Amino acid sequence: NPGDEVVYHEPCYVSYMPGTVMAHGVPVPVATRKRDDFSLKPEALAGVLTPNSRVLILNFPTNPTGGIASGEDLAGIARLCVEHDLIVISDEIYSELRYDDQAHVSIASLPGMRERTILLHGFSKAFAMTGFRLGYACAPAPLIDAMMKIHQYSMLCAPVTSQAAALEALENGAASMERMRQSYHERRDFVVRRLNEIGMDCHSPGGAFYVFPDVSELLSPDG
């Protein structure tokens, strides 16, 4: 409804804010910090929640920081979502691209969250299928029914060729995905090391395929 607040953590994927505005919502960003590995801290989330808060958008691993929410932070976030009756849109498109033996935990798996979570995923990242434009949503039936009222008139259906490619990826793509993940891991280590060696303060991302160096010390006063 107009005036409903949609909370999301920043830095973030570029579409969250304009998508909220297009739906007549009020965007409410919450900053994340390098010192916290760009995890959303429950206390930061609690500080922006109001009686108008309706939705929380999560994206872990995060575009563009590669940040990953710790289990402790996710549990605290889940408790706040239950307490404030929030719907969570959990964008987990990078969930397979995690490094340093970190297991993925979906907030939908935590107590009280399955019935209030819309989980978004797709084939673009883990299977390198960005051009196929194929994704999916998992949510309670009433939420899916509401989403379909818009989806059936705007998106129609996924191309048959994309669906066939996705089936092949699911049935036979695990080994290729793991090779790619290992390659990304090696590239991450190289890029982060080299950026730090030349004077950039670069956080080592826990997932996704981005690095997010701090260049503030290299900028002139006028940017």
Task: Give the positions of each predicted feature.
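PLP-dependent class I/II
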Residues: 1-223
